[in-house]
């Protein structure tokens, strides 16, 4: 494989010295970019864009042409696994993702296959290989998956949810069915991420978007336990280099210590967690990624710069910080504000790495 020209993102995840704090943005390939909208229109719809390796590669690279980002992230969706299990994924205008056949009971779980990453999900691996080739070693490529709990919420609720009553009903009334589903998803995610690593992903991230809706006890039992299983089963080295793993539970700031015990390399923080506090609590064990409020990108560039300076000062001197937003970038953010953010991180962070 091509030698990596910029490895500061991988180095920061492993708490190794870097010249400046690396930065990338969750959903950096997305609707805030006019060029993304043009490519998506060309693809026809969102899943067609995900399933076309050339177009998925194109949208992955678009933000890197605009901004000096330190990593690329595979353009895909967390719902590729449930889709490959045959749940019939479709997107309703204004509604988000929906499934035609949600999972309602243990019998439904038993019927679900564990998808073969090189077969039913082969289009994702083709995209990974294509992106790695086209990146030409400029920056590392991040692969990702949803967490078992987060995938299960969509599969049981039949789509997005505000109150999560359907999956919580299963959790409390039929926990055996939910554990069977989560176990199957943990196996599927492990295979899927390992296939992404073999195809060329140089780091992987597990997005636990909905872990924060659980009580602490339920989080341990129904979310973290299964992420821990995945971390235990991942390839941690490929192509002669360590493959760092980041866990991100949105709304999970109170559980950082437990998350750091999984053996992952880094934890993602949302904007509700104080990064100085997070570093005091777990900075000796893991790197931290985050954690500016994505809505700050609506502010004037001078205000964005102030916020970047505050977060950098909060983390403080030394290694182990990857700058990011606390969640995905909003679709109506002015692209030049994202540029001001990236530039501010690089310019203002140098003093912390001397």
UniProtKB/Swiss-Prot annotation:
Enzyme class, first EC level, given as a word: lyase
Q: What is its main location?
A: cytoplasm
- Spell out the molecular function terms from Gene Ontology: uroporphyrinogen decarboxylase activity
Localization per Swiss-Prot or TrEMBL:
Cytoplasm
Among SUPFAM superfamilies, the record links this protein to: UROD/MetE-like
Signal sequence residues? none
Query: Function, please?
Result: Catalyzes the decarboxylation of four acetate groups of uroporphyrinogen-III to yield coproporphyrinogen-III.
Q: What is this protein called?
A: Uroporphyrinogen decarboxylase
> Source species, please?
Citrobacter koseri (strain ATCC BAA-895 / CDC 4225-83 / SGSC4696)
């Amino acid at each position: 494989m091509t030698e990596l020209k910029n490895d500061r993102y991988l180095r920061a995840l492993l708490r190794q010295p870097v010249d400046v704090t690396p930065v990338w943005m969750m959903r950096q390939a997305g609707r805030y970019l006019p060029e993304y909208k043009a490519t998506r229109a060309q693809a026809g719809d969102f899943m067609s864009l995900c399933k076309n390796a050339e177009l998925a590669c194109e949208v992955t690279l678009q933000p890197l042409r605009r901004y000096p980002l330190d990593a690329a992230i595979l353009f895909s969706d967390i719902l590729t696994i449930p889709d490959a299990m045959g749940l019939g994924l479709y997107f309703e205008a204004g509604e988000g993702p929906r499934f035609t056949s949600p999972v309602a009971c243990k019998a439904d779980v038993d019927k679900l296959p564990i998808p073969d990453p090189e077969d039913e999900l082969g289009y994702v691996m083709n995209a990974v290989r294509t992106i790695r080739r086209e990146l030409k070693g400029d920056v590392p490529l991040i692969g990702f998956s949803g967490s078992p709990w987060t995938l299960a919420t969509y599969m049981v609720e039949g789509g997005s949810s505000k109150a999560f009553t359907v999956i919580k009903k299963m959790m409390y009334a039929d926990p055996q069915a939910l554990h069977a589903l989560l176990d199957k998803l943990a196996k599927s995610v492990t295979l899927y991420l390992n296939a992404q690593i073999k195809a060329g992903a140089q780091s992987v991230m597990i997005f636990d978007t909905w872990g924060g809706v659980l009580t602490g006890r339920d989080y341990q039992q129904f979310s973290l336990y299964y992420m821990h299983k995945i971390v235990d089963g991942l390839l941690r080295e490929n192509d002669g280099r360590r493959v760092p793993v980041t866990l991100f539970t949105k709304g999970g700031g109170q559980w950082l210590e437990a998350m750091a015990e999984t053996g992952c390399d880094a934890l993602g923080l949302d904007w509700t967690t104080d990064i100085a506090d997070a570093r005091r609590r777990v900075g000796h064990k893991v790197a931290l990624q985050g954690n500016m409020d994505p809505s700050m990108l609506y502010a004037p560039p001078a205000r964005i710069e102030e916020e970047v300076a505050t977060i950098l000062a909060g983390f403080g001197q030394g290694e182990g910080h990857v700058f990011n937003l606390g969640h995905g970038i909003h679709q109506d953010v002015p692209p030049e504000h994202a540029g001001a953010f990236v530039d501010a991180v690089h310019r203002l962070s140098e003093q912390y790495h001397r």
